[in-house]
Amino acid sequence: MKITKPHVAMFASPGMGHIIPVIELGKRLAGSHGFDVTIFVLETDAASAQSQFLNSPGCDAALVDIVGLPTPDISGLVDPSAFFGIKLLVMMRETIPTIRSKIEEMQHKPTALIVDLFGLDAIPLGGEFNMLTYIFIASNARFLAVALFFPTLDKDMEEEHIIKKQPMVMPGCEPVRFEDTLETFLDPNSQLYREFVPFGSVFPTCDGIIVNTWDDMEPKTLKSLQDPKLLGRIAGVPVYPIGPLSRPVDPSKTNHPVLDWLNKQPDESVLYISFGSGGSLSAKQLTELAWGLEMSQQRFVWVVRPPVDGSACSAYLSANSGKIRDGTPDYLPEGFVSRTHERGFMVSSWAPQAEILAHQAVGGFLTHCGWNSILESVVGGVPMIAWPLFAEQMMNATLLNEELGVAVRSKKLPSEGVITRAEIEALVRKIMVEEEGAEMRKKIKKLKETAAESLSCDGGVAHESLSRIADESEHLLERVRCMARGA
């Protein structure tokens, strides 16, 4: 069989924040850079947001081949109460034999393998099948910088940050405050630490690191990662900024009642509230949020899910809408829906977020600060209320609020206690009707312009980065052709 074009295999972790950017990266490689693309995804509950998205017209994955893989049974390998990151890591690790078999069966073998952070155990497949290997960071450059730098800390520096709670100073980057550090790196005795920190040594073994950001979003951090005298020395391989990867919006392909409702609202008058596919709040916090929204007197669209008693990521990979009482879910204040029905719209499961944030009626976004959500907000030109819950979201909130000036946030972290209805009301009004919100709206619309420039086929940084990756695959493919000819 004559091979005429490069073929990339991609391995995506479960969850919307991982699936969406992987699919968009695959579509870009196929549509603009001539790749055949195979994306391996773990099959999840049909009711989950991931399954709904993959089966929706908005996914628009005609350019790529999505291969569903059975989710391995990890019940005997992981404690049911383990942090979701550990569960994802073990799921991905246990799926590698299946991926190996799938690649062995392919007539057109991949020339490149792209894995995300939870799939790093698959990197050795590159050597087995003569593939280039790339690590895809679906999050941002700051997260990548910490993942690379943390394993290099000596005991004194680690003690300064973890015990004395001093900021972590990385070469060429803004310092990372203790309260913004991922829980992954804070307990050397935890399974999470033992699993993730050694991953820093894997990065230099691949052919490149792909990161979902662009120069104007994170100028200092990207410069450090690409400078061989700074963090580039630790990375040891090229770092390719290819962002923003966000799903293009086509309202004609999306049929959802929330879009019909938004069509009837004034421009920039609606606050969109969503905590992602896995974020969740306590019962008390949900109550305060509902009252804060009602007191603000602002229009809103709220993707609302039942409260949880555990961690803020307890709903990851699951979905549950709760019981309805007089039009109001039983976990919200009685009568909330009837009192707010003229200015509010409730969604209990998956919502077409990219379309919502691109709608002219939306003027603010209360977000958990997942990177995919942030990028969709930037591309939509929508300022944010930062409400970080877990993982790198605290770092993301600091970037939005303190460095870019496109978000407001509460006085304390949500993990430190309940944010009161009065503060929520003030935050909502600040972003929707006050001068501070108007200034942030101007800033984020300028950032939106730089995002479009990055994606431009006429010299955009993201396009040029992927062109270099395509060139590397073409060179490998040519070597394979020469070997086949006996050259």
UniProtKB/Swiss-Prot annotation:
GO biological process: lignin metabolic process; response to toxic substance
Top enzyme category: transferase
UniProt binding sites for UDP-alpha-D-glucose: 351, 353, 368, 371-373, 376, 392-393
GO MF terms, alphabetically ordered: coniferyl-alcohol glucosyltransferase activity
Catalytic-site annotation from UniProt: 18 (proton acceptor), 116 (charge relay)
Source organism superkingdom: Eukaryota
Known catalytic reactions: (E)-coniferaldehyde + UDP-alpha-D-glucose = 4-O-(beta-D-glucosyl)-4-(E)-coniferyl aldehyde + UDP + H(+); (E)-sinapaldehyde + UDP-alpha-D-glucose = 4-O-(beta-D-glucosyl)-4-trans-sinapoyl aldehyde + UDP + H(+)
Observed effect of gene inactivation: No visible phenotype under normal growth conditions, but mutant plants display a sugar-resistant seedling development phenotype.
Cellular compartment(s): Nucleus
Cellular component GO terms, alphabetical: nucleus
Any one Pfam family match given in the protein's UniProt record, by short name: UDPGT
EC number, as in UniProt: 2.4.1.-
Tissues where this protein is expressed: Expressed in seedlings, roots and leaves.
Keywords: Detoxification, Glycosyltransferase, Nucleus, Transferase
Amino acids binding an anthocyanidin: 18, 391
Keyword ATP-binding included in the entry's annotation: no
Keyword Nucleus (UniProt): yes
UniProt-listed InterPro entries: UDP_glucos_trans, UDP_glycos_trans_CS
Quaternary structure note: Interacts with SIS8.
Family: Belongs to the UDP-glycosyltransferase family.
Function: UDP-glycosyltransferase that glucosylates coniferyl aldehyde to form coniferyl aldehyde 4-O-glucoside. Glucosylates sinapyl aldehyde to form sinapyl aldehyde 4-O-glucoside. Is not active in presence of coniferyl alcohol or sinapyl alcohol. Can glucosylate the phytotoxic xenobiotic compound 2,4,5-trichlorophenol (TCP).
Protein name from the UniProt record: UDP-glycosyltransferase 72E1
Organism: Arabidopsis thaliana
